[in-house]
Amino acid sequence: MRVKGTNVTRIRRKKMIKLAKGYRGQRHINFKVAKQQVWKSYLYAYRDRKNVKRDYRKLWIARINAASRKNGISYSQLMHGFKVAGIDLNRKMLAELAVSDFATFSKLAETAKKQVSAPTRKAATLDTDIKIERIEKGAAKPVVLEPGKSTKTQEVAVAEKPTTASTVAEIKAYLDSESIKYPSSAKKADLLALVK
């Protein structure tokens, strides 16, 4: 006697048809066609989970660029000015500010414009009434940047001696705080030897 997989087969096929709900034509009725379309849909979903990140980044950059040009500065100069000023806002937040709170965005753009036009870019200062809080790498507490003060003077010094577990940047920060000269191309082992 031939055994037919009635219940199991029906359940399996109904599950696939349920996944194909809303498709046009035979793609939501016929099991064979529905199965192919569901598999193709999974491929589209996988691909577009990657693409949506790119698309949103493009959208944020377009919004920031439009708002920054209203303030007389290009997108690239704005981002460079933020980097020099030590303003760590991501593109998502900047785009949200550009759309919902243009006055604050304008103040930030003015700060960036001053940083770009300043002849010495190293000693950058914030002279707006916006307080920005960020956490320095290796710092014990957040560094608060206040108007009119240099970002260099507010950095927290690394107190403890670096160990082999410390990063090269932390070791260099320690050597800088102790005023120890070191070659810029020095390896981690050479820097640790200078610490001792």
Curated annotation (Swiss-Prot):
GO cellular component: ribonucleoprotein complex; ribosome
Pfam families associated with the record: HeH, Ribosomal_L20
Molecular function as annotated in GO: rRNA binding; structural constituent of ribosome
Keyword Ribosomal protein: yes
InterPro entries: HeH/LEM_domain (IPR025856), Ribosomal_bL20 (IPR005813), RIBOSOMAL_L20_CS (IPR049946), Ribosomal_protein_bL20_C (IPR035566), SAP_dom_sf (IPR036361)
GO BP: ribosomal large subunit assembly; translation
Keyword Ribosomal protein: yes
Keywords, ordered alphabetically: Ribonucleoprotein, Ribosomal protein, RNA-binding, rRNA-binding
Function recorded in the entry: Binds directly to 23S ribosomal RNA and is necessary for the in vitro assembly process of the 50S ribosomal subunit. It is not involved in the protein synthesizing functions of that subunit.
Entry's family note: Belongs to the bacterial ribosomal protein bL20 family.
Protein name, per record: Large ribosomal subunit protein bL20
Source species: Oenococcus oeni (strain ATCC BAA-331 / PSU-1)
